[in-house]
């Protein structure tokens, strides 16, 4: 059977599908922000199926012996949930205390999914909005672990800051009514809040990826045998002793 350097063809294809699935939700939200379609259309047709595909692949990965995909999926659940929690702490402080945000992005996503923009949020829209927000956070962490693998913690920080930059350059800014980098709302407080929120998110995902014993190598290393772009001091002893 065809095999890459340290990755079977089956796992390589499954990883590619999982990466695409993890990318669907943020791309769908960005596309909906252009006005070409709505989240109420994309959520059941694209976002939910992609989420179910990702879950199915992560669940079947251990049974198929896909160690790399198994590790990336499990670590993404840990790093993604923790990362979103600390990110939201910063965002809420920026919103409530310093008025650096126009409102709650998860609540906005929820009313867009349920088509309740004029009526306002309810329990279902909040549930779906926050669920999608956490799924996005998990998806971005999965992409990081599946592609970049073990790196020093600050690489995760750079990755998250890049996400923040793309976010503030995207059509979502027009949907929020704040303009590029929030210059029409709070030209200093908005980008500062977004960058700080993503900074702590990146630190968490980077720290988890560096410290966990099961973090995979970078994808190019496992595919083609390229030098592993990972921390040289692999903390096996510390992690395994806990």
Question: What are the residue ranges of the model-derived segments?
Answer:
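Aromatic-anchored segments of alpha-helical transmembrane domains
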Residues: 21-32, 84-89, 160-171
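Juxtamembrane "helix-exit" motif on the non-cytosolic side of transmembrane helices
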Residues: 26-38, 174-181
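Hydrophobic cores of alpha-helical transmembrane segments in multi-pass inner/ER membrane proteins
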Residues: 48-61, 139-142, 195-211
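N-terminal signal-anchor transmembrane alpha helix
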Residues: 72-95
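Interfacial helix-loop-helix junctions of multi-pass membrane proteins
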Residues: 97, 170-195
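Membrane-interface interhelical connector segments
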Residues: 97-122
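Internal alpha-helical transmembrane segments of multi-pass membrane proteins
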Residues: 138, 148-166, 222
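Short, highly charged, low-complexity non-transmembrane loops/tails of multi-pass membrane proteins
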Residues: 216-242
